[in-house]
């Protein structure tokens, strides 16, 4: 059934704010596990290990060409797309959002006849930050504006 399909891509998009928080916690944990010399390099992991969540987001903003448009750059490409759902419809076989994997699994099954099994894995247990302070949320929202637009557009489209 998949042989005749021209679209080869599938994607599941995560809430950008949750993704930043998860990335911060994961990077912070990774930094704390590193040895002395490797802690000296000024990287994203260094920023997570030494700064608050808001400081970490400031570091990401300062290095926007590398860390900006984190989701949309991989899903939509190098240029801004005004209608991300239309782009996904034209270029992706199936798409969804992590928080509604049930809808993605159903859509993929309807289109392919293949059943996917949902699994929860890869969770950072030792989270330094569980709740996002309002000031950090504002900073993340500004930094992830395009990713948030993509996520909200996709979520709205799949929940119709």
Regions found by a protein language model. Name each.
Residues 100, 116-160:
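PAPS-dependent sulfotransferase catalytic core
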Residues 1-13, 17-118:
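PAPS-dependent sulfotransferase catalytic domain
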